[in-house]
Amino acid sequence: MKQEKTIFEKIIDKEIPAVFVYEDDKAVVLMDKFPAVSGQTLIIPKKPVDYVFDLDKEDYDYIFALAKKIGPAMHKAFDAKRVCMLVEGFHVPHVHIKMYPVREGESLEIHMGDEVSDEILLNQANKIKGFL
């Protein structure tokens, strides 16, 4: 019996709308609809794997290489002091890297934030794209 698709699989398959920063044949980068920090993004491999250490080496290396590309763009786009990363899979059982742009004077508290409008997410995505 096939398990029901996760929300990330539905987004990847374009069954649920999302604001995309980047997409290729291996991964997507999305603006987080419920950010703990403004400008938070998600790097999600297209292959549905629950636990980061269950990824094959190629996909593991790829999502971290993608984080290395996205992080500096976020740093510039949001004038961040640092861009922090956290690999997760708790709320959605599909590996994803959460990228948090942390600005001067801010601290990072890990939680699911309030829903943000698509207009704000599109604006933020375009800022990041401008530095890729």
Regions found by a protein language model. Name each.
Residues 1-132:
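HIT superfamily nucleotide-processing domains
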